[in-house]
Design a protein with these regions (language model features):
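Class I S-adenosyl-L-methionine
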Residues: 1-107, 124, 137, 198-207, ...
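Glycine- and acidic
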Residues: 33-38, 158-162, 429-436
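Signature of N6-adenine DNA methyltransferases within the class I
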Residues: 43-51, 69-76, 84, 92-99, ...
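Generic, well-ordered alpha-helical scaffold segments in large soluble proteins
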Residues: 51, 55, 99, 103, ...
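Flexible, charged surface loops at secondary-structure boundaries
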Residues: 57-59, 80, 125-128, 323-325, ...
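Conserved acidic residues
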Residues: 62, 131, 406
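Conserved residues in the N-terminal Rossmann fold of short-chain dehydrogenase/reductase
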Residues: 117
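Polybasic, glycine- and aromatic-enriched phosphate-binding surface used to engage nucleic acids
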Residues: 287-492
């Protein structure tokens, strides 16, 4: 909850964007962003509601469905824009439903907007004629979605012939439910987080919207990650428009620029559908034809080891629970790569160590048995044997630390990844990726490669998140390209 001293400042934060939704503003102040995040409640700024309605304002709809209506910002604006259309607002949260009804009464729209309290994924929606599905679906990460709903998502996608990851967020469930409900002539216009444009779980959504089965992409506008759309949520954002039952045609792509949807390009529907990442088509400058050698041809890119509970397995500085022979010096903080601690022997000696016990504890020398017994008792007391990772690791205590790679790569931040050589053979946990040469590589060649990558890697080659944050998965690193001349020294 937010303390009284913060209320005025918080209200000022929302007031400029709410266009008179005082009830919604008050709700956001009373329930801070962290408490709302679990339910995916982030109210849409009024200017974006209007821009999305501008996108479809020249068309006629008989029914407009606000999917995950919150306090009704889309429903109320749509009722004013489309005075003849039937407006349906669907919201599951009982408190928001009460605020929505209150707002409709205050706006004199109680008879224009039908409110349905329930889960959009399963409620029956009364509709007639051509229907528009619009809104800001709740953004709930897969960690907070029950196994039952993950199964629902996978099976419903499978019924459409689409393989879907259970790691998808709740917003993808709403996109699926809308697509299932659409008939020829219907349309959708949503603002969602933008991760699905590029990442693995998003491939199902990209197939759903761009696969040509029944939907056709119309427009795609991505927010600049450094300029968040929402006042209190550092999430990436994209406005997506798709129609049902129309012939594929060029898709308008661009940016959410200031308070407008700015179209920069027209991309062939087939070209967009075939692209492994869609966000690249929304940038001001489209990528040049690919040249050079993919890094994945030279290196195997591997995530760092997942311990399951770093607090138990990563030994604090000076911690003497285990003999040194039963632990390994490891990179455990991204800052250690940024500061290039691994460049020197003394730097590696200062790294924290990670417990590395053999699977067979009987193999431990007698003089170390008591220390190991004490360490494992402490780890159990911390719950290290009950984490998901430990329960799927046989035996639970054997954290199989990675063989030292030739080089490390940081993978998340508001800067391009940092590439560092590993001459003193440190290991690493999952705060970095490791580069393992597919063939022997000379130290001068490795140095030239890393220097080039540190100088020339574009932040946008990763997966962009809100607040300018970029994440580079192993596949993203493997797809980076280097000129052939870097290998032989003819290109710096």
């Amino acid at each position: 909850m937010t303390g009284p001293s913060n209320v005025a400042g918080q209200l000022a934060l929302f007031d400029a964007e709410s266009d008179g939704d005082a009830l919604g503003d008050a709700y956001c102040v009373e329930n801070d962003a962290r408490s709302r995040r679990v339910q995916g409640i982030t109210l849409t700024p009024a200017w974006l509601v209007e821009r999305m309605l501008d996108e479809i304002s020249g068309e006629r709809f008989d029914t407009i469905v606000d999917c995950g209506a919150g306090t009704g910002r889309f429903a109320i604006a749509a009722a004013r824009r489309f005075p003849v259309a039937r407006i349906v607002a669907v919201e599951q949260n009982a408190e928001l439903v009460a605020l929505l009804r209150q707002r409709l009464w205050e706006c004199g729209l109680g008879n224009r907007v039908a409110v349905i309290e329930g889960d959009f994924r399963v409620v029956a929606i009364p509709r007639v004629g051509r229907t528009l599905f619009i809104g800001n679906p709740p953004y709930v990460r897969h960690h907070d979605i029950t196994a039952q709903w993950k199964e629902w998502y996978g099976l419903r996608m499978a019924s459409l012939g689409i393989a879907a990851s259970r790691l998808a967020g709740l917003h993808t469930h709403f996109l699926l439910r809308s697509a299932e409900s659409m008939q020829p002539g219907d349309a959708m216009c949503f603002v969602t987080s933008a991760e699905w444009l590029d990442n693995g779980y998003g491939s199902a959504v990209r197939t759903l919207l761009g696969g040509g089965a029944c939907l056709s992409m119309i427009g795609l506008w991505v927010a600049d990650p450094a300029q968040p759309v929402f006042a209190d949520a550092l999430v990436s954002s994209v406005v997506v428009r798709a129609d049902c039952g129309v012939e594929p045609h060029p898709v308008r792509t661009g940016m959410i620029d200031g308070q407008s949807l700015r179209t920069l390009h027209e991309v062939g529907a087939t070209q967009l559908a075939a692209a492994p990442r869609w966000s690249v088509w929304c940038r001001p400058t489209l990528e040049l034809p690919l040249v050079g050698i993919e890094l994945g041809e030279l290196f195997r890119v591997t995530r760092g080891q997942v311990t399951g509970l770093n607090a138990a397995w990563v030994l604090d500085d000076g911690q003497l629970d285990l003999p040194r022979a039963l632990s390994v010096a490891s990179v455990t903080r991204a800052k250690e790569l940024i500061d290039d601690v691994v460049a020197s022997k003394s730097g590696v000696e200062r790294l924290r160590r990670v417990a590395s016990l053999p699977a067979d504890l009987e193999a431990i020398p007698d003089e170390h048995r008591d220390a190991v017994t004490r360490f494992l008792a402490r780890a159990r007391a911390m719950g290290a044997d009950q984490t998901y990772i430990a329960r799927h690791r046989k035996p639970w205590h054997a954290v199989d630390m990675r063989v030292p790679p030739a080089a490390f790569v940081s993978y998340m931040g508001r800067r391009p990844p940092v590439f560092r050589a590993n001459p003193w053979r440190a290991s690493f946990i999952n705060i970095a990726h490791g580069l393992y040469p597919r063939q022997a590589i000379a130290a001068p060649v490795l140095r030239r490669l890393l220097d080039h990558l540190n100088t020339c890697t574009d932040l946008h080659a990763g997966r962009m998140y809100g607040g300018g944050m970029a994440k580079f998965e192993p596949g993203d690193i493997a797809r980076l390209r280097v000129p052939a001349g870097v290998l032989d020294g003819t290109v710096a």
